[in-house]
Amino acid sequence: MATGVLPAPVSGIKIPDSKVGFGKSMNLVRICDVRSLRSARRRVSVIRNSNQGSDLAELQPASEGSPLLVPRQKYCESLHKTVRRKTRTVMVGNVALGSEHPIRIQTMTTSDTKDITGTVDEVMRIADKGADIVRITVQGKKEADACFEIKDKLVQLNYNIPLVADIHFAPTVALRVAECFDKIRVNPGNFADRRAQFETIDYTEDEYQKELQHIEQVFTPLVEKCKKYGRAMRIGTNHGSLSDRIMSYYGDSPRGMVESAFEFARICRKLDYHNFVFSMKASNPVIMVQAYRLLVAEMYVHGWDYPLHLGVTEAGEGEDGRMKSAIGIGTLLQDGLGDTIRVSLTEPPEEEIDPCRRLANLGTKAAKLQQGVAPFEEKHRHYFDFQRRTGDLPVQKEGEEVDYRNVLHRDGSVLMSISLDQLKAPELLYRSLATKLVVGMPFKDLATVDSILLRELPPVDDQVARLALKRLIDVSMGVIAPLSEQLTKPLPNAMVLVNLKELSGGAYKLLPEGTRLVVSLRGDEPYEELEILKNIDATMILHDVPFTEDKVSRVHAARRLFEFLSENSVNFPVIHHINFPTGIHRDELVIHAGTYAGGLLVDGLGDGVMLEAPDQDFDFLRNTSFNLLQGCRMRNTKTEYVSCPSCGRTLFDLQEISAEIREKTSHLPGVSIAIMGCIVNGPGEMADADFGYVGGSPGKIDLYVGKTVVKRGIAMTEATDALIGLIKEHGRWVDPPVADE
């Protein structure tokens, strides 16, 4: 072991051989617990913020687990408001991409590229929906030849939308199609490297350098051709398709994703080619956000200004896909990051355009208004890795008549607002809250709402409504009522909602001693108003910035609040409360919730959500809340799916098969299933799925357990049942629940 202190400031720090650089004029405060590594090359998994102070971060060697404290890296223009990151302009055909231009919207065709007419028709439908750019898969020479005809036909029909070739394992195909398409997407994990076998390989320094020389030899001709023809390029890393070489040194990590892309970017820069963008995609929004932030932090260090293409890969379909995409893309847009976006849905590609546009509009508005809060010092947020700030869950107090320990859930809570009308039919209310009914009595289940808010309490003589609430309280469901209601129509054992004014004015002291408090606040209040939180006992905080607020950013106000709480060791759980206006579109609601609440939960900031919308279906709001928690890798209440959006490589009707599998397996919380049209990027694309259903050849399916294929060539008509059999084989199956009578 070694500890020590280096002089500060230290200029131009660079950790030897790790490819992790740090900018000039930064202070290296101290180095501790540095162990000698087996290799000359330091293995690095992730940069992590330290709790030691605002100017520190931890650099974690992958195998030894010893923190190296280094200066905290900048990853966005501002920590207290949305300011769009300045980038160079990259030309993709006739479309300019970068910070001086609108956030560009794009998608990808699903037709067989060799079907020229079908592909042309699909591109036109996409363009008519408003996309700026379209990507087409090009897997071989026949597809590359077809691309020339596709481009010609579109031009003849006055469709000049830029076309992007999606390339995997095919450098020669990339060279061919660069002569007609406007942009080439290369995957650093498989452009020059073989498909990952998930083997840990020990390289000497010379062996590693030879691998890099091989990449340069294979990649250079494409760079030179793109320069010659004025083509753009996307260096697009996928978390699931990192090479064995990268994973051996950096782990299956955001750090490895960044280094994989930088290897290719260094070659581009060496050849004086700069018309390229980066992407860091993953199916897990938490990993995706970390990777993009780390990428940008490294670009700041090097003085690079290349634009970003944002996307969550294999997001799925319907609300799930929109939610995952909003959590990942929306979070980064609030940080001012992102110049073009794609929402990857297992739906027709033109259906991706509307949610794409909604996300782009959110990001554009936030940056234009520079939504935020007054500057504040941020010391405690972990934005290069996930470390959840866990609020103290309620504990039972002496003399309490009911059990409050389950009014919040340790993995993330869902709160709902209910009306007096709903109390008129108690059994329907119990079902709406997803309780399990036994002889008409409610009991909490896996996906039951944890607590409810009533803005108006029933009259004291309304025995039906009050009995319904008592039964909910008796099974540890929290019932929250405003202070004024509880003082005039007291409900035994209710929790009481108070604001900061009611706290500072002492009105809450009119309540019986021991009453549980729920505090509602915005997060941008003067610190002297927040000071009262240090002197009270609250069961939870509801963080609520009005939806119509234009100048204050919900995300930045919450970050400021969490900073105050952490700095003062106030550990109340915080629930993100969003009250949507009447008439909001469902997709808009999902995307806002994913952006504004998900953007905090992926940083480990928050203990649950409460979504309100006066004219939206109650079940929809409840399901959306649970989907949000699951999308942020918090509380699992249903089967998790990793489902690719389909492309020209897909070997079956992905939408139809996906629906069939979901119908039969959606009741398996804690189980994750990958549904992949092909395995072009290798089994790593299935992320951390427990089981995989993958197109192996036309009409045939391969089944996976983890990243290992266990059954090959199953007829498609039998494959879904075979998947269920595999789940049963591994002890992960339960029969679907029987509906309550």
Curated annotation (Swiss-Prot):
The keyword Isomerase does not apply. Disruption phenotype: Albino phenotype and seedling lethal when homozygous. The phenotype is caused by an early arrest in chloroplast differentiation. Pfam families: GcpE. It is an enzyme of class 1 (oxidoreductase). GO terms for biological process: isopentenyl diphosphate biosynthetic process, methylerythritol 4-phosphate pathway; response to bacterium; systemic acquired resistance, salicylic acid mediated signaling pathway; terpenoid biosynthetic process. Its cofactor is [4Fe-4S] cluster. Expressed in roots, shoots, leaves, flowers and siliques (at protein level). One of its GO terms (cellular component) is chloroplast stroma. Induction: Circadian-regulated with a peak in the late period of dark phase and early period of the light phase. GO terms for molecular function: 4 iron, 4 sulfur cluster binding; 4-hydroxy-3-methylbut-2-en-1-yl diphosphate synthase activity (ferredoxin); iron ion binding. It comes from the Eukaryota. Keywords: 4Fe-4S, Chloroplast, Iron, Iron-sulfur, Isoprene biosynthesis, Metal-binding, Oxidoreductase, Plastid, Transit peptide. Pathway: Isoprenoid biosynthesis; isopentenyl diphosphate biosynthesis via DXP pathway; isopentenyl diphosphate from 1-deoxy-D-xylulose 5-phosphate: step 5/6. Belongs to the IspG family. Homodimer. HAMAP family: IspG. This is 4-hydroxy-3-methylbut-2-en-1-yl diphosphate synthase (ferredoxin), chloroplastic. It comes from Arabidopsis thaliana.
